[in-house]
């Protein structure tokens, strides 16, 4: 919390792979205030999520999707993960970073990609700005 600006100020794209909501909210809020691109990957058990937010272009944010920390917050240490899932999430995240660097429009921008390693299922969910979002005045 005390050094996020020092770490992030020189980077237009921020990658998040943290496994707790407090840190995700901190990174989300920093990126939206500073108009950064945030590419976030999260995994748990057999499932993964990938977010691609471009806060330069009026994107919804992580708080729009999840306004509060769930009371039953889980993490990789307590629940475990399918080991190949970490590689999948990292590869998908890296792919989104490369597309952002090359200014290639991504269908994932502003959306949530949900993937399941047991069934090899992939779904894309359109994220909308939440009118009650804590960051609604920063969305543009």
Regions found by a protein language model. Name each.
Residues 2-140:
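Glycine-rich phosphate/adenylate-binding loop
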């Amino acid at each position: 919390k005390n050094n996020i600006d020092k770490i992030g100020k020189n980077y237009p794209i921020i990658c998040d792979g943290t496994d707790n909501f407090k840190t995700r909210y901190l990174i989300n809020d920093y990126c939206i205030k500073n108009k950064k691109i945030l590419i976030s990957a999260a995994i748990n058990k057999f499932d993964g999520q990938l977010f691609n937010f471009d806060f330069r272009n009026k994107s919804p944010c992580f708080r729009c999707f999840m306004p509060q920390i769930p009371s039953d917050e889980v993490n990789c240490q307590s629940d475990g993960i399918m080991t190949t899932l970490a590689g999948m999430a990292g590869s998908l995240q890296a792919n989104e970073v490369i597309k952002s660097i090359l200014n290639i429009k991504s269908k994932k921008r502003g959306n949530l990609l949900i993937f399941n390693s047991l069934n090899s299922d992939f779904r894309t969910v359109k994220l909308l700005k939440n009118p009650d979002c804590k960051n609604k005045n920063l969305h543009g």
